[in-house]
């Protein structure tokens, strides 16, 4: 029979609708609710087989295209590799309800069976992965290294795969056998009261295999402690707080499981001259009031290969004005573009003047015209009106 018909859903059903339909039927035909009922057991296996296919996006796509006997269905098609025994059907059942057992409650079974899942120590979902642990290291870069990119060698402590046994944990290939209790699945299904549950196999600790002749070097773990040098290529444009992920450079997994990842966290030292704002650089440039009045061309520092660039400061520039030098900022870490260099001009008032300098400034002040100081004139006009309002 068609899997969609078995679950009572349309071919356009969403994954959530398929799961909901399966849950309802699986509870209805569960053998613990129908003891000794052969037809209920058959239907339970049937709906479990249908969900095993339709609940998996890849299997469902193959089934929709080719039917039960499609090229990706395995030997004998989907049905031939389906729920031939009750243990497989119960495992599918546990997978569909896994996230709702025990724990902090509120799930489907807690409402249906009064929290029996927690009472029996049920675990949600599949067993945790035995992949090696991920590692993290911090690296400090100079401002220039972050701007240009750099290669670094890091010394990382952790676990590596045991060379003596190639990570298997056994002296020889014959030193490993399939667990007799769980038949290699890593889980055992037990019937407790009203329903059945899957739990980690106690004989193999969920590995699915038992090492009878452990490696003398790693003592059956498949890995050993190690310190190694890791070459890291840090791209230009990184900033503090960013991290680089190096897949497979973490701890080796136990008994041949995949290695974890290495995360390199970046810290960038501050620069004495530049501030960074995204990909833009900000440079505070102090100039004298004469240069501000007359205008000037100045050599200013940059992070580019040339080291400097010439900046034209227009006459009459005011303190706080920002001049933009395009393309002289930080490179974007995700592409080929660069930010800009933003030069914030700070006009400095002279201090500790000599008598001669003071006399020259007084002579200049005597020649001032209103148009020389438009802001000053505007301000005086405003306060003149302000005081006239309070005149008696």
From Swiss-Prot:
Gene3D superfamilies: DnaJ domain, Heat shock protein DnaJ, cysteine-rich domain, Urease metallochaperone UreE, N-terminal domain
One of the GO BP terms on file: response to heat
Pfam families: DnaJ, DnaJ_C, DnaJ_CXXCXGXG
Alphabetized GO MF terms: ATP binding; heat shock protein binding; unfolded protein binding; zinc ion binding
Zn finger intervals (CR-type): 149-227
Keywords: Chaperone, Cytoplasm, DNA replication, Metal-binding, Repeat, Stress response, Zinc, Zinc-finger
Cofactor(s) of this protein: Zn(2+)
Transmembrane region(s): none
Lineage: superkingdom: Bacteria
Positions annotated to bind Zn(2+) 2: 179, 182, 201, 204
Ranges for domain J: 2-67
Cellular localization per UniProt: Cytoplasm
GO CC terms: cytoplasm
Binding site for Zn(2+) 1: 162, 165, 215, 218
PROSITE patterns associated with the record: DNAJ_1 (PS00636), DNAJ_2 (PS50076), ZF_CR (PS51188)
CXXCXGXG motif repeats, residue ranges: 162-169, 179-186, 201-208, 215-222
Free-text cofactor note: Binds 2 Zn(2+) ions per monomer.
Free-text function comment from the UniProt entry: Participates actively in the response to hyperosmotic and heat shock by preventing the aggregation of stress-denatured proteins and by disaggregating proteins, also in an autonomous, DnaK-independent fashion. Unfolded proteins bind initially to DnaJ; upon interaction with the DnaJ-bound protein, DnaK hydrolyzes its bound ATP, resulting in the formation of a stable complex. GrpE releases ADP from DnaK; ATP binding to DnaK triggers the release of the substrate protein, thus completing the reaction cycle.
UniProt subunit comment: Homodimer.
Entry comment, domain topic: The J domain is necessary and sufficient to stimulate DnaK ATPase activity. Zinc center 1 plays an important role in the autonomous, DnaK-independent chaperone activity of DnaJ. Zinc center 2 is essential for interaction with DnaK and for DnaJ activity.
NCBIfam families with a match to the protein in the record: DnaJ_bact, PRK10767.1, PRK14284.1
PANTHER family: CHAPERONE PROTEIN DNAJ, DNAJ HOMOLOG 1, MITOCHONDRIAL-RELATED
Family statement drawn from the similarity comment of this UniProt entry: Belongs to the DnaJ family.
Name used for this protein in its record: Chaperone protein DnaJ
Organism: Chlamydia trachomatis serovar D (strain ATCC VR-885 / DSM 19411 / UW-3/Cx)
């Amino acid at each position: 029979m068609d899997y969609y018909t078995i679950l009572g859903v349309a071919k356009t059903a969403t994954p959530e609708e398929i799961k909901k339909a399966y849950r309802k039927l699986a509870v209805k035909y569960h053998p613990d609710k129908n003891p000794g009922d052969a037809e209920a057991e058959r239907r339970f296996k049937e709906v479990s087989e249908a969900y095993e296919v339709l609940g998996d996006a890849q299997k469902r796509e193959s089934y929709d295209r080719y039917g039960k006997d499609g090229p990706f269905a395995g030997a004998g098609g989907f049905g031939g590799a389906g729920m031939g025994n009750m243990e497989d059907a119960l495992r599918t059942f546990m997978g569909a309800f896994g996230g709702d057992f025990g724990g902090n409650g509120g799930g489907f079974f807690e409402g249906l069976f009064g929290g029996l899942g927690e009472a029996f120590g049920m675990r949600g979902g599949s067993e945790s992965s035995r992949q090696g642990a991920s590692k993290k290291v911090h690296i400090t870069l100079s401002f220039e290294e972050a701007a240009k990119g750099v290669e670094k060698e890091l010394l990382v402590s952790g676990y590596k795969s045991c060379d003596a046994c190639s990570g298997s944990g056994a002296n020889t290939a014959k030193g490993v056998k399939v667990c007799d209790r769980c038949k290699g699945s890593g889980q055992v299904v037990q019937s407790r009261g009203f329903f059945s549950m899957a739990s980690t196999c106690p004989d193999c600790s969920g590995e699915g295999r038992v090492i009878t002749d452990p490696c003398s070097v790693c003592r059956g773990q498949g890995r050993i402690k190690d310190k190694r040098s890791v070459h890291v290529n840090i791209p230009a444009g990184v900033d503090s707080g960013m991290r680089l992920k190096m897949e497979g450079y973490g701890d080796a997994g136990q008994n041949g499981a995949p290695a974890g990842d290495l995360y390199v966290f970046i810290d960038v030292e501050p620069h004495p001259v530049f501030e960074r704002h995204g990909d833009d650089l900000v440079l505070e440039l102090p100039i004298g009031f004469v240069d501000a009045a007359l205008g000037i061309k100045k050599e200013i520092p940059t992070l580019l290969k040339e080291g400097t660039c010439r900046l034209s400061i227009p006459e009459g520039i005011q303190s706080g004005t920002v001049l933009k030098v395009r393309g002289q900022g930080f490179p974007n870490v995700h592409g080929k573009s660069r930010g800009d260099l933003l030069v914030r001009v700070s006009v400095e008032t002279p201090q500790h003047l000599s008598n001669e300098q003071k006399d020259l400034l007084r002579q200049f002040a005597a020649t001032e015209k209103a148009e020389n100081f438009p802001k000053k004139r505007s301000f005086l006009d405003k306060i003149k009106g302000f005081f006239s309002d309070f005149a008696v």
